[in-house]
């Protein structure tokens, strides 16, 4: 399981200025605030025209000329300046992959000490949708046993403050534990690099992550559909 929320994409104006620096073509930039008419970016030169609901909400929109230049540039360094901030809740086994693929530029997280003791462990804290009980193999019910053991260690830690019980939680905790919410900063260039590697990944979480990439604003700058 993976949960992505509080997404914010920024840096478009800086990226466009930097992209146009080599040719001194800043005056050709046609992006700006949407007002639905000639004051600001109008519908005729809006790159988001086809999918727009035409609410004229004074949001910033990418112009067709800027969009066309972005699509044509072979050296797309401007993507590094389009920053994406988001919160991700995912299991430990996914976070290990996350750092392997270097998806994030910066990550803020809580300390393991405070996080593990904050609440009792429940089945909802684990990604276990693929666990089954089959014949003599009781994989799913074994998780219940582990949860009981974790809660026993947690209670002893809260009562005694003895760190040896905290170690019981740390070293017994399964990689499927997904109560791991972290705030991530990345950019369009990084997402462009990892998308081809991850979109057909064995882990469901990476497939869902790539679906999220596909839904980002102007995601055509990130990947080529085939």
Can you name each region flagged by the protein language model?
Residues 1-225:
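Family-specific signature for flavin-dependent thymidylate synthase
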């Amino acid at each position: 399981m993976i949960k992505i929320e509080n997404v914010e994409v920024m840096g478009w104006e800086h990226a466009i200025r930097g992209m146009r620096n080599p040719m001194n073509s800043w005056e050709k930039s046609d992006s700006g605030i949407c007002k639905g008419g000639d004051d600001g970016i109008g519908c005729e030169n809006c790159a988001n025209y086809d999918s727009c609901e035409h609410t004229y909400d004074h949001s910033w929109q990418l112009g067709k000329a800027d969009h066309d230049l972005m699509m044509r540039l072979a050296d797309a360094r401007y993507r590094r300046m389009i920053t994406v901030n988001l919160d991700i809740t995912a299991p430990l086994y996914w976070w290990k992959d996350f750092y392997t693929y270097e998806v994030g530029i910066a990550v803020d997280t809580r300390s393991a000490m405070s996080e593990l003791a904050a609440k009792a462990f429940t089945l909802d804290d684990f990604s276990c949708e693929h666990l089954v009980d089959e014949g003599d193999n009781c994989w799913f019910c074994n998780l219940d046993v582990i949860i009981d053991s974790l809660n026993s260690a947690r209670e002893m830690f809260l009562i005694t403050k003895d760190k040896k019980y905290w170690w019981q939680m740390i070293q017994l905790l399964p990689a499927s534990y997904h109560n791991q919410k972290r705030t991530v900063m990345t950019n369009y260039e990084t997402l462009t690099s990892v998308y081809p590697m991850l979109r057909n990944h064995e882990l469901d979480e990476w497939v869902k992550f790539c679906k999220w990439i596909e839904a980002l604003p102007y995601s055509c700058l990130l990947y080529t559909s085939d």
